[in-house]
Structures are given as structure tokens and as C-alpha cells.
């Protein structure tokens, strides 16, 4: 499997990258870590004539706090996410999820922006970003705009990004101190996409669930924010009847493909299993 021929560009600034993408139009694709784009180029599912490599743009790298948000540059690697003490304290679910992406070699190159941006339903960050209520900063020829992660994904590899735009940063509201969290992922082997996965972030008070948010990975042609499933957990002790209702609501919105990871019915049920496990672990971690 060999990609088609292409011209290679390596801009030094966001402005230069946007100018290149605008000039080259639909024949160009931005290149982050390459672990989503290069495989589909090898199979000729993507045949860009130009690659715009973003790795020399320092403004796309870094983790900082702005008000009540954590802001992560799009070219920040998964390895850097795992090693960040700041994220471990503020958003530990990002570290937990990053550790389940591929393998250490890929995590040294793979970026949070690349994982989130291109609309691959098998990637782990999109559903997590929806669960966390994140927003994407998109920068293009008309300047920067903000799009909620829950509004960004339109279909497999189809997103709200416009021609000439780049995902430059991800803004994530910091959950309350003492929140519970978990990312549960079923996969066939190290490095594989999820058969099904679930992200859960919740808060507890007096033994009752106060807030709950759920994201589901690779069980539809987009990541899924299971809003209704989260709502039925609120006000409960997260006991079995409440979990049964949440699982049923989450399973009802899935539409996985039957593939080498299993038939659609199996993958739907595994989404429910992953959700149940994630809620139970998140509950155990939450402080009342």
C-alpha cells in the first residue's frame, strides 16, 4: 500500500499554513501526526496532491489554563498529554484515554488535534471531547471561530471545518474538584480501534448523582454524546435500575457497522457494557 504522489509543504506559522490551505484548496490536507491521514492515503481513500505539515508551528503546541478552561494546542502529542502533571490534576480522564490510544511509538507522534479533527469515528478523542463539553478553535482566512465538539461531527470523515481552516486549539471546561471519571475501551489488540468505548464524567453529592455526561466511541458513523442516558442518572444513587435505564438509552442511539470487530448487535451490547463499567468506576472515584 503506497500513497499517491503529493507535494510537501512545511509552514512556520498558523498564518502561513492557512494561506497555503486557502491557496491550494481541496487538493491540500493538513498533516499533524499522520496516524489518521497516512493510513487512508495508503489505501487511496484519500489522495491529496499537497500535504501541509504543521509540526514546525510552535503556536499549536502547549497546555495552559484560561479562566475556567484548559486550552490544549492542536499539535500537542498524546505523549505530552500523558506526561502533564497539570492535566493529571485538572482533567485526568485525558491521560487515561491517551494511554489507551494505539501504542507508545504512535503516541510520541500522534496529536490531540489530529485525533479530534478529521472525523474518524474510531478515534478516541472525539467522544471524550463531546463528553467534556469541549469546543474547537478553528482558524481560517476569515479569522478564528469556536465550534462545540458536539456540533462538529457530521458523518464519517465529514466535519464542520471549512476550506482553508485548521483546528488550532481545544478548549475544555475544567470539571469540578472531586468529579468522577472513566474511559472504558474494548479492543481486539494493542493499537486497534475500539470495538466500543465509553467516556463518563460525573459529580456526586450526598450519595446522589448531580451531573453526568457520556460519550460513545466507534458505535456510529460519528462519535455520540448520549445526552438522555446522562440525564436519567442525575438524582439517582447510580444503582442498577438507574444504570439499566442509562444503558438502554445509550444502546438505542448506536448504529455500529458489522465488521471484523463483530456484528452490529454485539458492538451495541458492548457499548452498554463499557458504559456500565465506566459509570461504576467514575462513581468510585467521585467525592461526595
Swiss-Prot record:
It comes from the Bacteria. Its cofactor is FAD. InterPro entries: CO_DH_flav_C (IPR005107), CO_DH_flav_C_dom_sf (IPR036683), Diverse_Substr_Oxidored (IPR051312), FAD-bd_PCMH (IPR016166), FAD-bd_PCMH-like_sf (IPR036318), FAD-bd_PCMH_sub1 (IPR016167), FAD-bd_PCMH_sub2 (IPR016169), Mopterin_DH_FAD-bd (IPR002346). One of its GO terms (molecular function) is FAD binding. It catalyses: CO + a quinone + H2O = a quinol + CO2. Pfam families: CO_deh_flav_C (PF03450), FAD_binding_5 (PF00941). FAD binds at residues 32-36, 111-115. Coiled coil: none annotated. Its EC number is 1.2.5.3. The keyword Protein biosynthesis does not apply. Keywords: FAD, Flavoprotein, Oxidoreductase, Plasmid. Binds 1 FAD per subunit. Catalyzes the oxidation of carbon monoxide to carbon dioxide. Dimer of heterotrimers. Each heterotrimer consists of a large, a medium and a small subunit. This is Carbon monoxide dehydrogenase medium chain. It comes from Afipia carboxidovorans (strain ATCC 49405 / DSM 1227 / KCTC 32145 / OM5).
